[in-house]
Swiss-Prot record:
<dbReference type="GO" id="GO:0016887">
    <property type="term" value="F:ATP hydrolysis activity"/>
</dbReference>
<dbReference type="InterPro" id="IPR027417">
    <property type="entry name" value="P-loop_NTPase"/>
</dbReference>
<dbReference type="InterPro" id="IPR002999">
    <property type="entry name" value="Tudor"/>
</dbReference>
<dbReference type="GO" id="GO:0051321">
    <property type="term" value="P:meiotic cell cycle"/>
</dbReference>
<keyword id="KW-0378">Hydrolase</keyword>
<feature type="domain" description="Helicase ATP-binding">
    <location>
        <begin position="46"/>
        <end position="212"/>
    </location>
</feature>
<comment type="function">
    <text>Probable ATP-binding RNA helicase which plays a central role during gametogenesis by repressing transposable elements and preventing their mobilization, which is essential for the germline integrity. Acts via the piRNA metabolic process, which mediates the repression of transposable elements during meiosis by forming complexes composed of piRNAs and Piwi proteins and govern the methylation and subsequent repression of transposons.</text>
</comment>
<dbReference type="Pfam" id="PF21010">
    <property type="entry name" value="HA2_C"/>
</dbReference>
<feature type="domain" description="Tudor">
    <location>
        <begin position="866"/>
        <end position="931"/>
    </location>
</feature>
<keyword id="KW-0217">Developmental protein</keyword>
<dbReference type="Pfam" id="PF00270">
    <property type="entry name" value="DEAD"/>
</dbReference>
<feature type="binding site">
    <location>
        <begin position="59"/>
        <end position="66"/>
    </location>
    <ligand>
        <name>ATP</name>
    </ligand>
</feature>
<keyword id="KW-0347">Helicase</keyword>
<dbReference type="GO" id="GO:0005737">
    <property type="term" value="C:cytoplasm"/>
</dbReference>
<dbReference type="InterPro" id="IPR013087">
    <property type="entry name" value="Znf_C2H2_type"/>
</dbReference>
<keyword id="KW-0221">Differentiation</keyword>
<dbReference type="InterPro" id="IPR035437">
    <property type="entry name" value="SNase_OB-fold_sf"/>
</dbReference>
Length: 1374
């Protein structure tokens, strides 16, 4: 023995005496052990461990290797009086904790003393712990941090056959440390099913001559029960003449039938053979399927098979359960319960039951031998789940689920020859098919060379192209910079502070980036919650139902964001949890609110872990007096900003076929002029055969899913010309339902729900109503006084006379302006005006004085009077008031506790609503009866061309602050009212008072509102009014005709509002299949990155954005949707965790410019403006070829981008980089809290300035070769903006910037010749609009807006658009 060896032995003896002797005295090391099979191999195992640096131990499940081998080593250390420190890895947290608990019980010591565990943030250990169970990730992180494993005497890696990415990388690290600084540590590799030779070969060690492969020890376990194997070719009695298509893995309809028959065979025949009728309950059938869709299909086929068995004695009593990873915890628990006597449990499971979950009473296994495997295309970063044949190792593992407590059978639904000769022995390692981002970051933290050289040491090294693409993605994310010590490297890059944090967090890197940006933008707490929720499988329940969708809308609170839905749900749960009386209250609340309690608890645990890890890297919320504070509404916008930054370049543009203008025109024609924001339609109803109003109740039932309270808020209309049924949802989107569920924008929540109802079925879901035979229908409808039948016209609905139509106060076509008083304000887009002309004032005062005069006695209604919707009464202006006014009954509600009926009434002369008991109503009879025939004295109005500011109200509804300000400015006051248009009896107006700024403009100036385009139908009406008013000013005859037209039509008719009637059930003998409901506002999304631009896009079904509608149809600028994750299904992209971005013009391009690695501005031919932007990693400086073409993102601009914008964006990018900057020898930024506080305040200042800046609209022009980079002369980063030179001197961070400064625009002024041409062109368009000539066959093009105009009305409407007016303003045309 050499002197060095003697020193080492002496050190070990001292260490053992100091650190182990107290433990030998404290704990019992001579325990009596159980008789597990592995006990017979104990001496051999210990001898091999002593003699070899690495051993491979293979043994079947249940042989005892996981619990006993570490204890063998522990006890041997006691007998040999040696130091030991053992660590054992498990692939799953629950396994590590439960095994540690079991071993501590066997050793009769408290958990956390001699035996402990560590999983994520949960740890149970102490200085005494010598046997530690942990997850693979915990050991890997520990070894990366310490860069040695000499701290451990024994490293035991269990379940290595699973070959997950972390395990493969851990094997690299362990082998590397064995060969360098940890040669004395013993390594034991263990698994139930393992390709032992490959592992033994991988861990071979050099000797004097050649190499020594790691020895393999096999432990056999004599099975107590037999499991017989059967294959598809053994099932002759069940088979039809059908051959499996092995080239295309999947399940045909025939094979579902085979499996269903097999279940029946198991239930009938086998139980007779085994006498199961004598058992307390019948053993379970476990069916392995590849995914949730297949589980659903198998469930359907099984139940259908049962329904076809007529004889009840032959019908099996099956209790069918589903089992998969996203199943709520309370549903998973049912799988483990014993079935009722005489019942047989059938479990339809994914591979979760293969190893993660054990069902004890399984006798029969039906295995389709399929699995769903995740593959990631590293060039696009799109992941896809492929169905493929399982490996033999998987099938053996599945077989092991049976034969635990009784004999069993496994039926493999493949031919024996295929199983034995063509199925792989083991599944391909994850490292070859899954994302490598986390692995490469861990490789960078190891500091042992470039990532590709480290990963080349893997058992199955990934392709170099996959490593290259992953490095490019990490550079795009900001985890790596483009260079290594200043030199560009394609396969490597220096690690940034952002990259270090990403490597420390147990999350997808994009989610980690969301947290980092949350820190920069002062929303760290919220970003952590959203990130943790996105990392969970799904905290929401009932996603495949309209109720679940409504609940998700409720949690999203009008934000249109899945991330914000997670945030709101978690905060509500946490608050409720603090107040809840007991666990059952909490469980029932979460179920009621469609939340998964277990997922929320796991999420809370993960939030604690994330915060703990962030504290270790110096990232925590600043708490000083100067810290940034956001209002709740600002916070919604900022959260969307950081999502746009974190999930760049997953940007999608919602598109309507043919463009916005065409969509608006089509909406108008498809709905017959009805409002697309609250109307849906069905097709397939033949009005010549059927009388629509008889089936109104059925139509409402289809859309209300049994909630009859919703029927009052639906109006059903029938169109004879198109054979369509229209359903309008009453009340606006901002008057949301009691659940508070709504979406951003103007579209009613019930329109979203209606389309969701259709999409939950097939894409063209057919809805059925039952109808009467025509003769019966005519007879019944006539009897009910619903109308009458005409041979020439068919059914004619009942109509009512509108008397005194000439007294209507709704602005007539000749009224350009009027003087009115504001009588009631609901919000800026809904208020009521009463004209102040003498005639109207006299009528109003007459009504008011008589209703409140002692000379007129108001009579009560009889107690048994039947009130009806639409009836006019006299009612007190408010509860308990003695002032009465005319009111119309709108809807009612029965109060069960008191028996009262409460009515919502609308006051016709004031414009407000109230809820009153019917005892408060008085008759309008006798001398007051004439009042029933006078139209209301107020009309509904909306401020024209404005909408809520997207910054203070991202939900698109008016805030309480803006409504209160509007009330202060207007309520009870008199204004000059300029009438823009009247649509559906609602006037779009401008409110003016003397020389003051119009109210519309003032609200924009105060930042409460932003500009809004008027709707297509509003512009149509505006054009018609302007032309008619122009004709009146030029022609006295026209003026006379228009003024007196109303007097010639004193009797007007409208379809009467009919009470809902239901024909007798026995007369509904026919069926009509309807298609719908449909909305003309339905849109699709398109990707903006090169690799996705030609692929159709779907939003995942459980997203709040799974129904995409054009929520602001009048707005012409592009909206943007951001997805956290994107995966491929066939040729289709599926977006998960989607968020609709704020309705701010230019928001998408602004976000791309703020968060992209670099960009290039594309200009028009004259270089007078930027028409599109190209962002990405840039191009090769020599060839001009894109460095990462698949991720290049192109966006066209529809707003004007200025040098001021670039200056502000550069200031923001520089500040973000400053916050994240570390010098090369630093791992954490060295700023004090005050410096960070100031920098974050600057971030707030810059982002608010960028978002609030009002930009002019411009026409969309696509630059040629949108995705091609153009070689340009290198710009010095310091020249990117005038202010950046000073910054560069102050603090040099641009050697490794994540967000380098963008180049200046360098635009040229518009030439005088071009200006002159555009002005002449404008004059020509305005002249043409005044004529009645026909336009050329293919229309004309507005040269300023690049818009084709096919008809004169289109031309006139275009001239009113903000785009055209902004363009006129830019060229100074008057």
């Amino acid at each position: 023995m050499s002197m060095a060896d003697e020193d080492e032995e002496h050190t070990k003896a001292l260490k053992a005496k100091e650190m182990m002797l107290p433990l030998f005295q404290k704990y019992n090391f001579t325990l009596k052990h159980n008789k597990l099979p592995i006990r017979h191999s104990k001496d051999d195992i210990l001898a091999r461990i002593r003699e070899n640096p690495v051993i491979v131990l293979e043994g079947p499940t249940g042989c005892g290797k996981t619990t006993q081998v570490p204890q063998f080593i522990l006890e041997e250390a006691y007998h040999r009086k040696e130091y030991c420190n053992i660590i054992v890895t498990q692939p799953r947290k629950i396994a590590a904790m439960s095994i540690a608990k079991r071993v501590s019980e066997e050793r009769k010591c408290e958990l956390g003393t001699l035996v402990g565990f560590k999983v994520g943030l949960k740890e149970c250990l102490s200085p005494d712990t010598r046997l530690l169970y942990c997850t693979t990730g915990v050991l890997l992180q520990s070894l990366i941090n310490s860069k040695t494993m000499a701290n451990y005497t024994h490293v035991i890696l269990d379940e290595i056959h699973e070959r997950e990415v972390d395990m493969d990388f851990l094997l690299i690290v362990v082998r590397r440390f064995l060969a360098t600084n940890s040669s004395k540590t013993k390594v034991i590799l263990m698994s139930a099913t393992i390709d032992s030779k490959a592992f033994a070969e991988y861990f071979k060690t050099p000797k004097k001559v050649g190499y020594l492969t790691a020895p393999i020890i096999s432990v056999d376990r004599p099975r107590l029960y037999e499991v017989k194997e059967f294959y598809y070719d053994d099932l002759d009695k069940l088979r039809l003449d059908f051959a499996i298509d092995y080239e295309n893995p999947g399940i045909s309809s025939h094979m579902y039938t085979v499996a269903a028959k097999l279940v029946l065979v198991c239930d009938r025949l086998i139980e007779n053979m085994h006498g199961e009728e004598r058992m307390e309950y019948k053993p379970t059938v476990l069916i392995f399927l590849p995914g949730i869709n297949e589980i659903d299909r198998m469930d359907h086929v099984l139940r259908e098979t049962l329904t076809r068995i007529v004889n009840p004695k032959e019908k099996p009593n099956l209790d069918i359960h589903r089992l998969h990873s996203i199943l709520p915890a309370d549903e998973q628990v049912k799988v483990f319960r014993k079935p009722a006597p005489g019942q047989r449990k059938v479990i339809l499971s994914t591979n979760i039951a293969e190893s993660s979950i054990t069902v004890p009473d399984v006798k029969f296994i039906i295995d389709f031998c399929l699995q769903r495997v995740l593959f990631t295309d590293t060039t696009t970063n799109f992941s896809t789940l492929r169905t493929e044949w399982a490996s033999q190792a998987n099938c053996i593992q599945r077989q092991g689920r049976a034969g635990r407590v009784m004999d069993g059978r496994v039926y493999r639904l493949v031919d024996r020859r295929f199983y034995e000769n063509q199925m792989r022995f083991s599944t391909s390692p994850e490292i070859l098919r899954c994302p490598l981002e986390n692995v490469i970051l861990k490789a960078k933290l190891l500091e042992m060379g470039p990532p590709h050289s480290i990963l080349a040491l893997a058992m199955n090294p990934p392709d170099l192209s996959d490593i290259r693409n992953t490095v490019l993605q990490l550079k795009e994310l900001g985890a790596l910079v483009q260079t290594v010590k200043g030199n560009y490297e394609q396969l490597d890059g220096d690690l940034t502070y952002m990259g270090r944090i990403m490597a420390k967090l147990p999350l997808d890197l994009r989610i980690s980036k969301l947290i980092i940006l949350g820190y920069i933008f002062s929303v760290l707490e919220e970003s952590i919650i959203i990130a943790a929720g996105m990392n969970e499988k799904n905290i929401f329940l009932n996603q495949n139902s309209v109720r679940g969708y409504s609940q998700k809308m409720y949690w999203a609170d009008g934000s249109g964001s899945d991330g914000i839905a997670i945030l709101n749900a978690y905060i509500a749960w946490k608050s409720r949890k603090e107040q809840a009386g007991n666990e059952s209250d909490m469980a029932s609340w979460t179920r009621r609110m469609s939340l998964d309690l277990k997922c929320l608890m796991d999420m809370a645990e993960l939030i604690r872990e994330i915060k703990d890890r962030l504290n270790h890297v110096g990232m925590k919320e600043v708490s000083g007096p100067g810290r940034v504070v956001w209002s709740s509404r600002e916070k919604t916008v900022i959260l969307k900003v950081i999502m746009a930054g974190a999930f760049y370049p997953n940007y999608f543009i919602p598109m309507s076929v043919g463009g916005k203008e065409l969509m608006e025109r089509q909406s108008f024609t498809e709905l017959g002029g009805r409002d697309p924001c609250n109307t849906v339609f069905f097709t397939g109803f033949d009005h010549e055969k059927y009388i629509g109003p008889l089936y109104t109740v059925q139509i409402k039932k289809l859309l209300s899913e049994g909630d009859f309270s919703k029927h009052q808020n639906m109006k059903v209309m029938y169109d004879r010309t198109t054979n369509r049924i229209f359903v309008t949802f009453l009340g606006s989107n901002d008057e949301h339902d009691q659940r508070g569920a709504f979406m951003p924008g103007k579209v009613h929540a019930d329109v979203y729900r209606a389309i969701k109802l259709r999409k939950l079925g097939s894409r063209n879901r057919i809805m059925e109503i039952r109808t009467m035979r025509q003769r019966d229908a005519i007879e019944f409808a006539t009897e009910m006084n619903l109308g009458h039948w005409e041979d020439a016209n068919g059914w004619v609905p009942r109509r009512k006379v509108i008397r005194n139509a000439h007294l209507s106060v709704i602005p007539a076509i000749h009224q350009a302006s009027m003087v009115c008083q504001v009588t009631n304000v609901i919000h800026c887009n809904k208020f009521y005006l009463r004209p102040e002309d003498t005639k109207n004032k006299d009528i109003f005062m007459d009504i008011h004085s008589k209703l409140n005069s002692r000379g007129y006695r108001l009579e009560r209604f009889d107690p048994d009077w039947q009130f009806a919707v639409g009836q006019m009464v006299a009612a007190p202006l408010e509860e308990g008031s003695d002032r009465y006014a005319r009111a119309v009954l709108k809807n009612y509600k029965n109060i069960r506790s008191t028996g009262d009926v409460m009515w919502t009434v609308f006051f016709l002369d004031y414009g407000h609503s109230s809820v009153l008991g019917q005892s408060a109503f008085r008759k309008l009879d006798g001398p007051l009866a004439y009042m029933k025939e006078i139209p209301q004295r107020v009309f509904e109005a909306t401020l024209s061309e404005i909408q809520p500011s997207a910054i203070i109200s991202p939900q698109g509804i008016w805030t309480a602050q803006s409504i209160n300000r509007f009330k202060e400015m207007t309520l009870g006051k008199i204004f000059v009212v300029d009438v823009y248009s009247v649509v559906n009896d609602v006037a779009s107006v401008v409110l003016k008072k003397g020389d003051e700024v119009p109210i519309n403009s003032e609200l924009i100036r105060l930042k409460f509102a932003q500009y809004a385009e008027e709707s297509y139908i509003s512009k149509l009406d505006h054009d018609m009014r302007e032309r008619k008013q122009r004709e009146m000013s030029l022609d006295e005859d026209v003026r006379y005709e228009v003024y007196h037209s109303s007097k010639n039509n004193q009797l007007k008719y409208e379809e009467d509002e009919l009470e809902d009637v239901s024909p007798p059930e026995e007369k509904l003998r026919c069926k009509v299949m309807l298609s719908g409901p449909h909305s003309p506002l339905e849109t699709t999304a398109s990707s903006t990155v090169r690799s996705g631009v030609m692929k159709p896009v779907t939003i995942e079904n459980d997203s709040v954005n799974s129904i995409l509608l054009d929520s602001n149809p009048q707005d012409t600028h592009e909206k943007m949707l951001v997805g956290a994750f994107v995966h491929e299904q066939g040729n289709r992209l599926v977006v998960r965790q989607a968020s609709m971005m704020p309705n701010i013009p230019g928001f998408g391009p602004l976000m791309a410019l703020i968060f992209c690695p670099t960009c290039q501005m594309k200009k028009d031919e004259e270089e007078t403006r930027v028409v599109s932007i190209l962002t990405g990693l840039g191009c090769d400086k020599n060839t001009g070829e894109s460095l990462f073409p698949e991720h290049d993102l192109a966006l066209t601009l529809d707003v004007v981008l200025s040098d001021d914008d670039i200056t502000e964006i550069n200031a923001l990018r520089y500040t973000m980089d400053t916050i994240l900057h570390t010098d090369q020898d630093q791992t954490v930024p060295k700023f004090g809290d005050v410096s960070i506080e100031n920098l974050k305040a600057k971030v707030k200042q810059y982002i608010i300035k960028i978002l609030e800046h009002e930009r002019k609209f411009m026409d969309i022009r696509h630059a040629p070769n949108d995705y091609d980079w153009k070689l340009v002369e290198e710009n010095n980063a310091a020249e990117a903006s005038s202010s950046s030179k000073k910054r560069k001197q102050d603090f040099n961070i641009y050697d490794n910037a994540i967000y380098p400064l963008l180049p200046p625009l360098g635009l040229l002024p518009v030439s005088a010749k071009q200006l002159d041409f555009l002005k002449r062109h404008c004059r020509e368009l305005h002249k043409l609009a005044l004529t009645d000539v026909n336009l050329p066959r293919h229309g004309i093009t507005c040269q300023m807006c690049n818009t084709i105009l096919e008809t004169l009305p289109q031309l006139r409407i275009h001239l009113y658009s903000k785009l055209h007016r902004d363009r006129e303003s830019q060229i100074k045309f008057r």
